[in-house]
Amino acid sequence: DEAGIGYYVTIILGLGGKNYRNLHAIETARLLNRIHPRCIWALKLKVWEGTPLEKMIERGEVVPLDKEEILFEERLLLQNLHVEDCFFMDTTVLDRLTVQGWLPEGKDQMLSIIERLLALHFNPDGSRKKPDEQGQVSFKFLSPIGPSVNQ
């Protein structure tokens, strides 16, 4: 920051697994708020074959998040992000969507998109909808910086 050199940060959603999902989101946001990146690129955790993480999952030490649960983590992360002039991008949403925008200006729109995606998969009480109750996602670009999702 002192040198005036902007930098990009890559974060990994899902890294805390089910047990630490909320803590991971809040602590990641806290770190990002302190370091003031110019761009945040969110990726989804990928478990590679033969890695120590795969072994931890096999032993039940880590329970990975599914793609819909990662949306809960991303929502909590965005709710706790308080950065200025920072571009946020997640190209891994539900393995097929991109949520992106400038912070803080685009924060509400990105949260709205995530809320709409969550509503397709979860009931208001947080329970998962049955597959035949889940909505379909269609795309419509509202601006050059990111898609909107319509139900």
Predicted feature residues:
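Surface-exposed amphipathic alpha-helices with a cationic face
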Residues: D1-G4, L78
